[in-house]
């Protein structure tokens, strides 16, 4: 039963993804405890050890697959300011990610014995730096947002590479199926009529519910003047 009747209902679901690998750590204690950790809730006292990033320390986590969503921190009794970087690759997360269309590099203040969720982008890796004091982490996990739609299309051949291409294509377009059908889950996170053409073909081939396609087209039309080209690109209206 929906409680907020006047609200816009989010058609997406959310899954928590656990850390698959600890790629790099510096000035940390028990960093490996984050791998496969299934803790969700902060607590006042716990007999279990926690991960601690010492002041100036950092670590790099791998969630094992790229996804669209956020990262969620569950913190212990020591918390402070961190620098958080998202990356589709290790080199991006270890560098200075751009801020195009979503924040990929931010300074955040973590609460004591609490939870903080941050991000709205596509990523696989996160780097976390403790800036001003030691930080205790009970857990760090990814929050994947996606439309839980049945895949009704299928492709199979004797060439395993072609089979993987099909699987990757379906997964990629599913990441783009958010509030509307984005041109890209990381960037530009916008609805472009030109990008809708190949994406719509993939949606029609793969999923049972294709309502996101007309919804996205209606969105573009409603934001285009009668005398202007869609997305300001001359070839898009044709």
Residue ranges and their predicted role:
Residues 186-190:
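Conserved short loop/turn motifs at secondary-structure junctions
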Residues 191-192, 238:
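Secondary-structure capping and boundary motifs in well-ordered enzyme cores
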Residues 1-183, 194-195, 208-220, 226-235:
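Extracellular/oxidizing-compartment recognition motifs
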């Amino acid at each position: 039963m929906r409680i907020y009747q006047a609200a816009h209902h989010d058609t997406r679901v959310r899954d928590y993804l656990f850390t698959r690998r600890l790629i790099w750590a510096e000035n940390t204690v028990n960093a490996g405890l984050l791998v496969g950790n299934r803790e969700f809730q902060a607590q006042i006292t716990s007999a279990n050890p926690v991960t601690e990033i010492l002041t100036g320390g950092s670590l790099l986590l791998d969630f094992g697959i790229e996804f669209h969503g956020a990262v969620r921190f569950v913190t212990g009794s020591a918390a402070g300011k961190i620098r958080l970087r998202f990356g589709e690759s290790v080199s991006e997360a270890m560098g200075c990610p751009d801020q195009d269309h979503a924040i990929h590099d931010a300074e955040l203040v973590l609460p004591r014995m609490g939870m903080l969720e941050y991000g709205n982008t596509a990523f696989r890796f996160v780097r976390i730096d403790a800036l001003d004091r030691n930080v205790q982490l009970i857990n760090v996990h990814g929050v994947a947002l996606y439309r839980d739609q049945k895949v009704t299309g299928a492709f199979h051949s004797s060439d395993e590479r072609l089979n993987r291409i099909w699987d990757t294509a379906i997964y990629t377009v599913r990441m783009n199926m958010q509030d509307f059908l984005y041109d890209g889950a990381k960037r530009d996170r916008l609805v472009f009529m030109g990008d809708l053409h190949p994406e719509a073909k993939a949606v029609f081939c793969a999923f049972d519910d294709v309502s996101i396609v007309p919804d996205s087209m209606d969105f573009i039309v409603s934001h285009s003047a009668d005398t202007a080209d869609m997305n300001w690109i001359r070839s898009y209206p044709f």
